Amino acid sequence: SLTSLQTFDIKCEIRFVDNTAIKQEMKNFNSLFWIERQWFFECRAYSTKFYDETLFYSTNPFRRKKYRLSQGKSNKNRFQTILNSVHHVTIEDNNEINENTYYFPHATILTLASKVSINDITIVNNLQRILPLKQIQILEILSDHLCPLKMSELLSYMPNVHTLTFRSMSFDGYGKKLFEQNPLFRLISKINLIKSIHFYGKCTLQNLEIFLKLFPNLQYIEISVELQQIQLVLQYLLNKTNTNARHLRLLCFSCDGKESHYISKLIKSRLLPCDCKTIFDDQHLRLYIWW
């Protein structure tokens, strides 16, 4: 029944000649039923070249913590709508950033889906219209062939990110040494607060060297590694003389039972530079290593 209604979102545009009748209809939404539920609505009239319109929409549309800006859901009217309840914003592609007029003042988690290109020179300005970048604490970048320099540029506007998730890193056209010599690399390595990384792609030793130099405060890394590289990776990460890994305390390998067994054998054989403990999550295929 209507009295059990928990969520009510509405936005409609009405063309009219005489708006008197429309305004009278809208008054029905000022009744006690809506006020008790703290659902409020706004009606705005504006003119175009060919006709007059009324835009009627809910100003407190929902209490959801997450919102996905995808095709057909972005707010493309000329008025900004503020969504206070949302803490996690997911953006599907660059067009949704460019055309959207929603604003999420309390967002702390930002997910940029695979179709979002951070190479777009306008992406920072457009994101700032949607949410306060300095407030973001958890950032997910799911695009392929991610340029580390572009990622660093984006992170320079998000100094409070502590958890970073991404699934690729490409040095095509921009070598590892050039990246490390870039002033932006040195800046990010000094100011960032990132303590946790989740890397979904196959991780190489070169990737790890970059991660630990760029994010010197890392305490947790989740990665997937080719079987033949696992020993080299562990020896590098667990080496006590590796000052870049001095804060690292927990590793998570995305692996199957065979790889988990191989890593456990490595640890028991004492071929690694320090003693470790492990636990295998066979439900999620994750091996955790700590020391």
Please tell me what each predicted stretch does.
Residues 1-291:
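Eukaryote-biased activation of long, low-complexity terminal tails and linkers
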